Amino acid sequence: MEKRYELNKNLAQMLKDGVIMDVVNPEQAKIAEEAGAVAVMALERVPSDIRKQGGVARTSDPKMIKEIINAVSIPVMAKVRIGHFVEAQILEAIGVDYIDESEVLTPADDLFHINKKDFKVPFVCGARNLGEALRRIGEGASMIRTKGEAGTGNVVEAVRHMRTISSEMRKLQLTPKEELMTVAKEMGAPFNLIEYVAEKGRLPVINFAAGGIATPADAALMMQLGCDGIFVGSGIFKSDNPEKRAKAIVKATTYFKDPEVLAKASENLGGAMLGLEISKLETEFAERGW
């Protein structure tokens, strides 16, 4: 089991410095692949549509996911509800490359997340803070992402979550060793992972940005804040020119420290997706899970 987990972490490392795009059909998946995406997330409704339409959001139709798998050569991810291990069993059976236990879908279990160590396929999970990140890693997550606030086109929550995780890691590095067990208790996180972060100053898995990223500048901002890569959900295919915006966000993620490249990548993209103010949301997806 330990060897499998190490392999999954290494598989996730291969996505580092890349962009993962939400797609709802094979045509969008091909656009994402041609734009330079390192993987796609297959789902029936992007987060902005889930937010707009409401109701219970579940994992996508396996047939649709298989069509996307067959359409592209890059890895395909798909989402399951928090705690819904049977949805995860189904996705593993149809051959997805990664499973996202996602707060964007309606949680199936308000007490427990999936024990990801029961699966061979690697999992990605969202986190708002270091405690959440380490709990998910303790359950077997091979990759972490900020929760942000998906479907809003508003990057503020992703920034908040990344800054929180980074500041808590810096604080942990300054914590005396004899106090680490108390920190583990307070965070509800495995002690060995607390020790790892205190020593290394980073998570033991890669950490991507997700939730509200809509522009090349948003992607570069999150990379400069220390993220290992970018998830873009509604931001591409809810914009005026998806093909051009997809390529621009990939370029911005690669050249995130070069303002001249960022300026050029941001030109003539057409309108970005309509953004939402966080304080006016009826449902905050990031509050789901623990």
UniProtKB/Swiss-Prot annotation:
HAMAP family: PdxS. Keywords: Lyase, Pyridoxal phosphate, Schiff base. It is an enzyme of class 4 (lyase). It comes from Clostridium botulinum (strain Loch Maree / Type A3). It catalyses: aldehydo-D-ribose 5-phosphate + D-glyceraldehyde 3-phosphate + L-glutamine = pyridoxal 5'-phosphate + L-glutamate + phosphate + 3 H2O + H(+). Pathway: Cofactor biosynthesis; pyridoxal 5'-phosphate biosynthesis. The lineage of its organism: Bacteria, Bacillati, Bacillota, Clostridia, Eubacteriales. D-ribose 5-phosphate binds at D22, G151, G212, G233, S234. The active site is at K79. GO terms for biological process: amino acid metabolic process; pyridoxal phosphate biosynthetic process; pyridoxine biosynthetic process. It comes from the Bacteria. In the presence of PdxT, forms a dodecamer of heterodimers. InterPro entries: Aldolase_TIM, PdxS/SNZ, PdxS/SNZ_N, RibuloseP-bd_barrel. This is Pyridoxal 5'-phosphate synthase subunit PdxS.
